[in-house]
């Protein structure tokens, strides 16, 4: 009999704001069949035994026999006793150019494995178990789906939660690819060389445990690379652009893509390698890591814009997690609660539900970053993106952060429309190729175009000369000065802290609308660093810092003059709703003065300030 839900004891942290993301196990459908009590999972609609012991009995481990003396049983035969046929004396590895006495059954089985990767995996792929020795791989449902997609599609991107066993399924696919294809080079890329080497080790194990009739001969069997006698090879590399340049790969596998720094540079090197062949493959797998480059790759794949086939799997794909500590099926209720309590809800969503949360400590909240949309426009020859053309009756303010090193950091100029209550980014100059000698002339061109708008310049090493040239040489009177000697603003800890805090409020409260794609991308990797804010390793923050200058300026009294406002208090503009709520909560006390005495009449929920 089903038990009623106790709202005090049966709360789950995933169920927030009235949304039921996980049902209590007492609400699941049940049935009795074949002497087993079955419970229907809410995740895949399949029936599972109530007891974990029954689940293990139905999915029992299958050991692979050690067959080295019965070649007629070719499905498991390895000629281990013949050292002349072994590579470097290793019993599980066949030496190159060893002749195989093929039978019709062997040929048919070989073709079946070539054409059906799932059959190949479930029939011949094995792992070494710490207790049972060599056992057959038991594929999970998601692993079967992944194998089918990777095999049939040219470009695949997989958004997966942690600890699903993705390395195992990728290793099986790589082993299948090099065993059944001639002259194919495979490159494994990861954040670190040790991570790509781990994937290669798992692939080597999959090849090593194949029976002799499926295993190609070994030419090289090194720590960082292998080569087979069919001409195929696999190499493990760190994800630097130099790793793939000069090589021609038939397939590239990128592991933990979301955690690779400077991925843009690596991606520019990878694309020509893949595009060199019409059938070249690329496979990307990762757990999300905030809203960085992988978020863009995944979004483009889901929207069908990039040619990548998207696939995702989350924590409930591991069926052992659907049983509690008492080995009773609860559909993952206890496991998910314990995991969340051991970390945080946001971390659980990112690492176990493959959700794109903001990178830990980003200036702008992850929820806001996820809904920020950009407008795609083609920049002009100088790198200026125009989102809205200038209008004569509107008021604009510009901020400029000059690059300190040509070819490295970027010049970043933002032009903001401050006419209405909601401010809007209407133009962006973003370039790291413009010389600071000619930058004042280029900047002035756009400032004049936007109604000769005022500009606030950060006085860094090159900003001083740019501001001086703009104000004195070009006689542009719209340069906003902090003093008689400072033709702009000098960035300090205080100005940066106030500017960052103000910018966060402006964007999260929809006071400032951003249209520039690169600006939004920089926000995704602009996070807390000690007691300040900065771009994460391998990323830029020039566009964000130019907006931080605008955030600081908007808090200054002179902003009213440049924005052509009669009177403005930024807190009233940004937090109007919060201030109104405070006003309602703390209504004033009303004093009534009569002829004989004075008395007060408190308004309900009022508060006396006396």
Swiss-Prot record:
Superkingdom, natural source: Viruses
Gene3D superfamilies in alphabetical order: 3.30.420.240, P-loop containing nucleotide triphosphate hydrolases (3.40.50.300)
Entry-linked InterPro entries: P-loop_NTPase, Terminase_6C, Terminase_large_su_gp17-like
GO cellular component, one term: viral terminase, large subunit
Region (ssDNA-binding): 30-94
UniProt: Mg(2+) 2 binding residues: 401, 458
Binding locations of ATP: 138, 143, 202
Outcome after substituting residue 405 to V: Complete loss of nuclease activity. Almost no circular DNA packaging
EC number assigned by the record: 3.6.4.-, 3.1.21.-
Annotated site (Modulates nuclease activity): 409
Nuclease activity: region residues: 360-559
UniProt motif Walker A motif: location: 161-167
Outcome following mutation: residue 165 to A: Complete loss of in vitro DNA packaging activity but not the endonuclease activity
Residues of the active site: 256 (for atpase activity)
Residue sites binding Mg(2+) 1 per the record: 401, 542
Annotated motif Walker B motif, positions: 251-256
Example GO molecular function: ATP binding
Outcome recorded upon mutating residue 256 to Q: Complete loss of terminase small subunit-stimulated ATPase activity and in vitro DNA packaging activity. No effect on ATP binding and endonuclease functions
Region (Binding to the portal protein): 328-352
Region described as ATPase activity: spans on this chain: 131-301
Keywords of this entry: ATP-binding, Endonuclease, Hydrolase, Magnesium, Metal-binding, Nuclease, Nucleotide-binding, Viral genome packaging, Viral release from host cell
Family: Belongs to the Tequatrovirus large terminase family.
Name of the molecule in the record: Terminase, large subunit
Organism the protein comes from: Enterobacteria phage T4 (Bacteriophage T4)
Lineage per the UniProt record: Viruses, Duplodnaviria, Heunggongvirae, Uroviricota, Caudoviricetes
Name of the encoding gene: 17
């Amino acid at each position: 009999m089903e038990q009623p839900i106790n709202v005090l004891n049966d709360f789950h942290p995933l169920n927030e704001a009235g949304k039921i993301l996980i049902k209590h196990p007492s609400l699941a459908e049940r049935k009795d069949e074949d002497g087993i009590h079955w419970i229907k999972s809410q995740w895949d609609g399949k029936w599972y035994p109530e007891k974990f012991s029954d689940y293990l009995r139905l999915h029992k481990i299958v050991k692979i026999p050690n067959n080295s003396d019965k070649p007629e049983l070719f499905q498991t035969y390895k000629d281990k006793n013949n050292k002349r046929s072994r590579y470097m004396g290793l019993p599980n590895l066949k030496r190159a150019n060893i002749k195989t006495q093929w039978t019709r059954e062997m040929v048919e089985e070989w073709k079946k494995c070539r054409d059906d990767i799932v059959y190949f995996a479930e029939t011949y792929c094995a792992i070494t178990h710490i207790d049972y020795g060599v056992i057959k791989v038991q594929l999970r449902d998601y692993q079967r789906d992944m194998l089918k997609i990777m095999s049939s599609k040219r470009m695949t991107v997989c958004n997966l939660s942690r600890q699903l066993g993705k390395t195992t399924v990728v290793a099986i696919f790589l082993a299948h690819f090099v065993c059944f294809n001639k002259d194919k080079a495979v490159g494994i890329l990861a954040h670190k060389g040790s991570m790509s080497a781990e994937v290669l080790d798992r692939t080597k194990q999959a090849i090593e445990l194949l029976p002799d009739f499926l295993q190609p001969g070994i030419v090289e069997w090194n720590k960082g690379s292998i080569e087979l006698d069919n001409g195929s090879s696999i190499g493990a590399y760190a994800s630097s652009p130099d790793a793939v340049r000069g090589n021609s790969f038939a397939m590239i596998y990128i592991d933990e893509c979301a955690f690779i720094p400077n991925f843009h540079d690596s991606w520019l090197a990878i694309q020509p390698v893949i595009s060199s062949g019409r059938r070249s493959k690329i496979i990307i797998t990762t757990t999300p890591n905030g809203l960085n480059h992988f978020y863009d790759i995944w979004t483009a794949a889901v929207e069908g814009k990039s040619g990548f086939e998207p696939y995702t799997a989350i924590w409930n794909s591991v069926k052992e997690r659907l049983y509690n500590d008492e080995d009773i099926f609860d559909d993952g209720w206890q496991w998910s609660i314990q995991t969340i309590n051991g970390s945080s809800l946001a971390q659980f969503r990112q690492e176990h539900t493959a959700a794109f949360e903001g990178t830990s400590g980003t200036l702008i909240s992850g929820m806001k970053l996820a809904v920020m949309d950009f407008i795609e426009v083609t920049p002009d020859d100088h790198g200026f993106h125009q989102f809205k053309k200038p209008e004569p009756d509107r008021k604009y303010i510009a901020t400029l952060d000059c690059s300190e090193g040509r070819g490295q950091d970027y010049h970043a100029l933002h032009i903001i429309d401050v006419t209405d209550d909601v401010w809007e980014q209407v133009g962006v100059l973003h370039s790291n190729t413009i010389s600071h000698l000619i930058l004042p002339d280029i900047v002035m061109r756009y400032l004049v175009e936007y109604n000769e708008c005022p500009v606030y310049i950060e006085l860094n090493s090159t900003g001083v000369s740019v501001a001086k040239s703009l104000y004195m040489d070009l006689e542009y009177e719209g340069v906003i000065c902090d003093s008689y000697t400072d033709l702009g603003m000098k960035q300090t800890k205080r100005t940066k802290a106030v500017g960052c805090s103000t910018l966060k409020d402006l964007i999260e409260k929809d006071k400032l609308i951003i249209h520039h794609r690169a600006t939004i991308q920089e926000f995704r990797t602009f996070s807390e660093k000690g007691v300040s804010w900065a771009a994460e390793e391998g990323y830029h923050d020039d566009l964000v810092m130019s907006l931080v200058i605008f955030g600081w300026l908007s808090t200054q009294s002179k902003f009213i003059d440049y924005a052509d406002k009669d009177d403005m208090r930024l807190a009233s503009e940004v937090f109007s709703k919060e201030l109104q709520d405070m006003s309602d909560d703390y209504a004033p006390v009303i004093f009534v003065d009569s002829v004989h005495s004075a008395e007060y009449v408190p308004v309900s929920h009022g508060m006396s300030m006396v």
